[in-house]
């Protein structure tokens, strides 16, 4: 069973993620997954009181770039809509600070830029990727990404005020479209065709298999973040655990 659905007494990681968006600043959740977990996801959504939601069913694993793009391209989302992408296996405390930071940064969103959430390291760790950022005009501009370093390098970059890359993103639909068209146009076309030919029923989009399978398997970090010149950071000092890295 995936970690996000394991019951820790009376809670699960996916349940905690849904609780995080039970706030008036958010609209409705869109969950990207595959057929295997659909009943578990619907059970959680019902339990947390979500009447409106969308589930995007991927016919195959293609990593986070196609998953993010295909869940964005559904027609009901307006192009200027701000979107926040959350992983389902993270544990975040002080959600009031997390939500406050989203509200504070929304005014800076454009049709090209991307905000990533950085977490102040509680200790040097080789389990996570890092980034360096510098303050430019009221926001933090990402200057460098560092792949999961060894422990010695992690100690050095933490002293340079590096933040953990949490894998959570905040941007507009238009920005996603523009970035994929510019940096990953083939993935964009295959995902668009897959969404346009999808079947929609009972809150669920079944993506078109033939088109989706043509998408390259690649993470959003490699596909877009490493190529875009307009990456900004929302740097947070809150308790955070990526239990996806828990063995």
Task: Give the residues covered by each predicted segment.
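Residue-level signal for inorganic ion chemistry
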Residues: 5, 14, 71, 89, ...
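Conserved beta-strand scaffold positions in the cores of enzyme catalytic domains, especially
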Residues: 5, 55-56, 114-116, 231-233
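Conserved donor-nucleotide/metal-binding helix-loop-beta segment in metal-dependent transferases, i.e.
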Residues: 91-125
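Conserved N-terminal catalytic core of the sugar/cofactor nucleotidyltransferase
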Residues: 7, 11-85, 91-96, 119
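N-terminal nucleotide-binding beta1-loop-alpha1 segment
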Residues: 1
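A short acidic, often aromatic-flanked loop/helix-cap motif at beta-alpha or helix-coil junctions
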Residues: 61-65, 122-125, 151-152, 240-242
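Short acidic, glycine/serine/threonine-rich loops at helix termini
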Residues: 43, 95-98, 126-130, 181
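Catalytic core of tubulin tyrosine ligase-like
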Residues: 130-247
């Amino acid at each position: 069973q995936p970690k996000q659905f394991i019951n820790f007494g009376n809670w699960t990681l996916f349940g905690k993620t849904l609780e995080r968006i039970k706030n008036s600043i958010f609209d409705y959740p869109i969950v990207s997954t595959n057929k295997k977990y659909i009943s578990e996801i619907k059970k959680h959504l019902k339990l947390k009181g979500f009447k409106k939601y969308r589930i995007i069913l991927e016919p195959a694993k293609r990593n986070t770039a196609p998953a993010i793009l295909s869940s964005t391209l559904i027609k009901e989302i307006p192009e200027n809509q701000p979107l926040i992408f959350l992983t389902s296996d993270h544990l975040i405390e002080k959600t009031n600070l997390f939500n406050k930071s989203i509200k504070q940064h929304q005014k800076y969103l454009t049709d090209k830029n991307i905000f990533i959430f950085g977490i102040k390291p509680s200790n040097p760790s080789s389990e996570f990727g890092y980034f360096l950022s510098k303050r430019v005009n009221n926001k933090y501009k990402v200057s460098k990404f560092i792949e999961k370093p060894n422990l010695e390098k992690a100690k050095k970059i933490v002293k340079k005020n590096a933040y953990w890359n949490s894998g959570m993103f905040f941007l507009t639909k238009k920005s996603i479209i523009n970035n994929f068209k510019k940096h990953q146009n083939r993935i964009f076309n295959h995902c668009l065709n897959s969404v346009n030919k999808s079947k929609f029923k009972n809150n669920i989009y079944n993506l078109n298999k033939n088109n989706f399978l043509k998408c390259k398997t690649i993470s959003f970090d490699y596909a877009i973040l490493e190529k875009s010149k307009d990456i900004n950071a929302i740097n947070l000092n809150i308790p955070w655990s990526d239990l996806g890295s828990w063995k």
